[in-house]
Amino acid sequence: SCAGSCKCKNCRCRSCRKSCCSCCPAGCNNCVKGCVCKEPASS
């Protein structure tokens, strides 16, 4: 499950997209462990 509302749309990992509101850690390395939603870096 995903904590909070996910706002990052940079994820390109399909499995992560399906399981965690289109949000995943950099590199999509943690998809298998469950995505961790994070706020997008303020630019």
From Swiss-Prot:
Residues where a divalent metal cation 6 binds: C24, C28, C31
One annotated Gene Ontology cellular component of this protein: cytoplasm
Alpha: annotated segments: 17-43
Entry annotated with the keyword Metal-binding: yes
Residues involved in a divalent metal cation 5 binding: C21, C23, C24, C37
Binding of a divalent metal cation 1, residues: C8, C11
Annotated binding of a divalent metal cation 3, by residue: C2, C6, C11, C16
Gene3D superfamilies the UniProt entry points to: Metallothionein Isoform II
Chain sites annotated for binding a divalent metal cation 7: C37
Notes on the domains: Class I metallothioneins contain 2 metal-binding domains: four divalent ions are chelated within cluster A of the alpha domain and are coordinated via cysteinyl thiolate bridges to 11 cysteine ligands. Cluster B, the corresponding region within the beta domain, can ligate three divalent ions to 9 cysteines.
Protein family according to the UniProt entry: Belongs to the metallothionein superfamily. Type 1 family.
Protein name: Metallothionein B
Organism the protein comes from: Colinus virginianus
Lineage: Eukaryota, Metazoa, Chordata, Craniata, Vertebrata
